[in-house]
A protein has these predicted regions:
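Negatively charged
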Residues: 2-173
Length: 173
């Protein structure tokens, strides 16, 4: 399903009844689908490994996804990059296997949901994760980040004034 609706800027049809339980790759699926705003919370995404840029530029998308079981996903790079309307809870997601979260909420200007319970010990890339996510101001003080995790510009251009993640070897910008 990788790239299936990539660039389909007018697409906004119901998909919630689709069976996606065998799918492993949803990279760029709604990339640039700027009008898309349909429910997807019933999708069984248990086997998906890749969600790279899945909703990148899906600027109208604001549907619940908290019921998704993302336990097997390893790549969420840019997943909501530019999804400017998105502001739904994701606190039930188990992200223990994710290694890449760079740019995940970059320019997701409405997003302001709790993520403090996420276990991010395995993440190696958080560069620009919240850059330009201008509404985001949730505590992340319980996050323990690896010393080798890239965190450049993680909170640049935000109003973030809450507890920051712990990175034992250096400061987070």
């Amino acid at each position: 399903m990788s790239g299936m609706f990539n660039g389909a800027s007018s697409f906004n049809q119901p998909l919630n009844d689709w069976r996606v339980d065998k799918v492993t790759n949803m990279n760029t699926m709604f990339y640039g689908a700027s009008s898309f705003n349909q429910p997807l919370n019933d999708w069984r995404v248990d086997n998906v490994r890749y969600m790279y840029c899945m909703f990148h530029g899906a600027s109208a998308f604001n549907q619940p996804l908290n019921d998704w079981r993302v336990d097997n996903v390893t790549n969420m790079w840019g997943m909501f990059n530019g999804a400017s309307a998105f502001n739904q809870p994701l606190n039930d997601w188990r992200v223990d296997r994710v290694t890449t979260m760079g740019w995940m909420f970059h320019r997701a200007s409405s997003f302001n949901q709790p993520l403090n319970d996420w276990r991010v010990d395995n993440v190696k890339d958080m560069d620009k994760m919240f850059e330009y996510a201008s509404s985001f101001n949730q505590p992340l003080g319980d996050w323990k980040i690896r010393c080798d995790c890239k965190t450049q510009a993680m909170f640049d251009k935000t109003e973030f004034r809450n507890s920051r993640p712990k990175k034992p070897c250096c400061a987070i910008s």
